């Protein structure tokens, strides 16, 4: 019989992340297990959550040279572009709602020529009990809040090491390109673009 883990505040999660040794941010299992064993209470996230009907929002909670932690807010039906993580490790947890991660295998990429070929590989559902890690060997994916889930969702993302660009892909068009990443809020305060 498993015992339900009592949710902690986002501040307690940050303190726990800051105590993890640098080596923990290499293999994907250690941080994923930490997120599973340390669910975050929805109430403590309130200062970091912003919503936009047009696009999901990226809200920076904590950043060190080793990692960055953000909350991404998803309205019903919103999805990210298919993207990679620049050879960085990424772990995701969903303290509010549930989401799908659609993974892709990158068959070919010519970034200079802006061409690529992807094949869908698998889909994983994330919820409060099921955080996941992006496979560094096959890191191309998108996150989706399907209409049939019929609820807002919030995902917490831990990236090691922080990065400011990524490659986005259009599987349908066979194209790819680099984009600059930005935050809607940093440490609970709006960011001007």
Enumerate the predicted regions with their spans.
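A short glycine-rich, His/Asp/Glu-containing loop-to-beta-strand
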Residues: 47, 51-76
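A short hydrophobic beta-strand segment most commonly corresponding to one strand
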Residues: 91-92, 149-165
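Long hydrophobic alpha-helical segments typical of transmembrane helices together
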Residues: 172-193
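Conserved short histidine dyad/triad with adjacent acidic residue
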Residues: 71-85, 136-138
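Glycine- and acidic-residue-biased ligand/ion/polar-headgroup-sensing regions
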Residues: 76, 87-107
């Amino acid at each position: 019989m498993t015992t339900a883990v009592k949710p902690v505040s986002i501040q307690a999660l940050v303190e726990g992340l800051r105590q993890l040794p640098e080596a923990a941010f290499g293999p994907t299992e250690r941080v994923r297990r930490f997120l599973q064993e340390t669910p975050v209470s929805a109430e403590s996230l309130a200062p970091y959550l912003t919503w936009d009907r047009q696009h999901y929002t990226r809200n920076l909670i904590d950043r060190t040279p080793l990692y960055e932690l953000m909350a991404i807010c998803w309205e019903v039906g919103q999805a990210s572009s298919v993207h990679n993580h620049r050879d960085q490790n990424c772990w995701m947890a969903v303290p509010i709602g549930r989401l799908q991660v659609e993974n892709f295998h990158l068959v070919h990429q010519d970034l200079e020529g802006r061409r690529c070929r992807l094949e869908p590989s698998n889909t994983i559902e994330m919820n409060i009990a099921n955080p996941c890690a992006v496979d560094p060997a096959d890191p191309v994916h998108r996150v989706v809040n399907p209409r049939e889930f019929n609820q807002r969702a919030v995902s917490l993302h831990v990236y090691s090491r922080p990065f400011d660009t990524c490659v986005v892909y259009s599987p349908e068009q066979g194209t790819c390109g680099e984009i600059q990443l930005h935050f809607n809020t940093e440490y609970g305060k709006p960011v001007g673009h």
